[in-house]
UniProtKB/Swiss-Prot annotation:
Organism per entry: Rattus norvegicus (Rat)
UniProt keyword terms in alphabetical order: Apoptosis, Cell cycle, DNA-binding, Nucleus, rRNA processing, Transcription, Transcription regulation, Tumor suppressor, Ubl conjugation, Ubl conjugation pathway
Tissue expression notes: Widely expressed with very low levels in kidney and colon.
Region entry Disordered, spans: 49-74, 90-116
InterPro entries found in the cross-reference section: Tumor_suppres_ARF
Gene encoding the protein: Cdkn2a
UniProt GO BP: amyloid fibril formation; apoptotic process involved in mammary gland involution; apoptotic signaling pathway; cellular response to glucose stimulus; cellular response to hydrogen peroxide; cellular senescence; cerebellum development; epidermis development
Subunit structure: Does not interact with cyclins, CDK1, CDK2, CDK4, CDK5 or CDK6. Binds to BCL6, E2F1, HUWE1, MDM2, MYC, NPM1/B23, TOP1/TOPOI and UBE2I/UBC9. Interacts with TBRG1 and COMMD1. Interacts with CDKN2AIP and E4F1. Interacts with CDK5RAP3 and MDM2; form a ternary complex involved in regulation of p53/TP53. Interacts with NOP53; the interaction is direct and promotes ARF nucleoplasmic relocalization and ubiquitin-mediated proteasomal degradation. Interacts with TTF1 (via the N-terminal region (NRD) and a C-terminal region); the interaction is direct and inhibits the nucleolar localization of TTF1.
Protein name: Tumor suppressor ARF
Residue ranges of the region described as Interaction with CDK5RAP3 and MDM2: 1-63
Pfam family, one: P19Arf_N
Post-translational modifications: Ubiquitinated in normal cells by TRIP12 via the ubiquitin fusion degradation (UFD) pathway, a process that mediates ubiquitination at the N-terminus, regardless of the absence of lysine residues. Ubiquitination leads to its proteasomal degradation. In cancer cells, however, TRIP12 is located in a different cell compartment, preventing ubiquitination and degradation.
C-alpha cells in the first residue's frame, strides 16, 4: 500500500564527533512511483523543524545574530519602534521627540497607551524581544546541522 525507505542521517555537532542516525520512513497511500527528489524533499522538510528546535541558543553569538540587529541595512528594532522618532532629519522639534509620554504631541501629561515607557517593545533583553531575529539565527540552524547520507528502498518492501 505504500513505500518504505531507510534513511541515514549524519548530525554534525560542534565540539563533538558527528552522530549517525538510521530510521525508517513509510509513505502510506498510493503505491504509484514517486520521484526520489520529491521524497527526499519531504524528508528534509520533516527533519527541518527538529533541527531548528535542537539547535538551542548559541554560547557566543556573533555580531548581528542575537541583539535584534543586522550587520547591514535597517534594523528590525527600528521598525518595531514606530513611535520612537530617531535622527536629526525628522521635521518635529527635539522637545516633541522627547515628550513625557514618549510619543509626539503628548507633552505635559501621560500619553495614552504606553505611558512613560516609550516604545515598550524596545525595552528589556534583546533575546526577549518579539520578532524573527530574536534568539538564534534560523539561517545558521538550517544549513549547519544534518546531511542526508544514504537513501535506499527498504529491503522487506512488498508491492500490493
Amino acid at each position: 500500500m505504500g513505500r518504505r525507505f531507510v534513511v541515514t542521517v549524519r548530525i554534525r555537532r560542534t565540539g563533538r564527533s558527528p552522530q549517525v542516525r538510521v530510521f525508517l520512513v513509510q509513505f502510506l497511500g498510493s503505491s504509484r512511483p514517486r520521484s526520489a527528489n520529491g521524497t527526499r524533499g519531504f524528508v528534509a522538510l520533516v527533519l527541518r523543524p527538529e533541527r531548528i528546535a535542537r539547535r538551542g541558543p548559541q554560547p557566543h553569538p556573533g555580531p548581528g545574530d542575537d541583539d535584534g540587529q543586522r550587520q547591514s541595512g535597517s534594523s528590525p528594532a527600528l521598525l518595531w519602534c514606530r513611535f520612537e522618532l530617531r535622527g536629526p532629519h525628522h521635521p518635529l522639534p527635539t522637545g516633541a521627540r522627547r515628550s513625557a509620554g514618549g510619543l509626539p504631541r503628548h507633552s505635559g501629561s501621560t500619553a495614552p497607551g504606553r505611558g512613560a515607557a516609550g516604545c515598550a517593545r524596545c525595552l528589556g533583553s534583546p533575546a526577549a524581544r518579539p520578532g524573527p531575529r530574536a534568539g538564534t539565527s534560523r539561517r545558521r540552524a538550517v544549513f549547519a546541522v544534518s546531511t542526508l547520507l544514504r537513501w535506499e528502498r527498504f529491503p522487506g518492501h512488498r508491492q500490493a
